[in-house]
Amino acid sequence: MQQATKQPAVLLVHDYYQVPGGEDVVVANEKHLLETHGHAAALYVRRNEEISRMGALEKIRSALGMFFSIRTYREVRRSIRENRISLVHVHNTLPLIGPAVYYAALRESVPVVQTVHNFRLLCPNALFYRDGHICEDCTKKGLHCAVKHRCYRGSRLQTVLCVLSTRLHRALKTYSRLHYITLTDFNRQKLLALKQIPPENVSVKPNFVEPSETIVPYAARENQVVYIGRLDALKGIRLLLEAWARYERSGGGMKLIICGTGPEEAWCREYLTREKLKQAELRGFVPNSAARALMGQSKALILPTQWYEGFPMTIVEAFSAATPVICSDLGNAGSLISDGVTGFKFPADSAEQLAQTLNRLQHAESISDGALKTYQENFTAEANYRQLMAIYSKAMQKSGERNEPSCG
């Protein structure tokens, strides 16, 4: 009887943010995915909330960890040995883990895969967005631009530390030794602006979501569209309501349901009242399960984002419910939409074009089918696992080639 092949053990590394976010969910999902397929998946994690409990000396030591953390180096090496790790998969490292995790893995001759959730390696605030507009100054002019604008946590000192750490590890060519997962091809192209990263070391693998519980036939859906997200200027909520005012005045018959809270909530309420919009409703915070059900009952999800985004999970959740997505033509979000196939795109600065795009939903049954097909082919757990294993295999193969003794 043939013995089953043992799956490689993986160490997942993540620094949890103080406010829980999408990256935390991705790490949990990935761990579960690996374990479901027979992998041992160990965790090395830190939590940003630790900082609030630190004394002054510990905080200084923690800040220096952005350059190199002795604690990270020792603990990660120990974990690799104790858990017989074959590959280290890193998610977030700032501010407590730092680049020492890479050196710990490489010292143990274990390959490193880094998932790129944002633009941190190129932009200290990780967003390519500043003062109400997209900003790529640090890529085009240099990292000193971030110091000028206090781009990391609004602090000049912390921005200086972040910039110096990035410059140091660029000089050491730390980033050239890693394998990368970007969530979209758009993100891949941005990352490759860092010339020391070999293109063959960067693979595209999106995040995944579980399938929707039910698929409502498109013709049976409510005559409504839905916005799900933070009520924030960079999310395009003002542009959405300006477009909706045009849509209502032109005789459009659909309803708009807005789910979420945020700094623009008061403005939204005032705007709805002032413009006498009768077909738009603010619902406030809605749990994920209810939000997904609402998407499945709607004609479309609207995502009018004004920045590049990371990887909007709501798009994939909409696809899983066979719900078309109307999205601005920017960045990662725009790159996920195939116009006329899975949804519709509009110029990010045009409320008029968004209003006109809403009318394209009158005959969108085929778009609904295209969204579901795209989900089934690209964004299921099984599709994701196959993609992940191909990336892991490539990283381990290249690591093995580097570590083979020379025959000279």
Each predicted region: which residue ranges?
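A conserved mid-protein helix/loop that constitutes part of the nucleotide-sugar donor-binding site
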Residues: 24-25, 223, 227-246, 263-269, ...
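Membrane-proximal helix-turn-helix segments that form the acceptor-binding/catalytic region
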Residues: 107, 135-180
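Nucleotide-activated donor-binding/catalytic signature segment of Leloir-type glycosyltransferases, i.e.
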Residues: 269-289
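Short hydrophobic beta-strand element within catalytic cores of glycosyltransferases
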Residues: 315, 324-327
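Conserved acidic donor-binding segment of nucleotide-sugar-dependent glycosyltransferases
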Residues: 339-340, 344-351, 359-365
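A short, well-ordered alpha-helix in the C-terminal region of glycosyltransferases
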Residues: 366-390
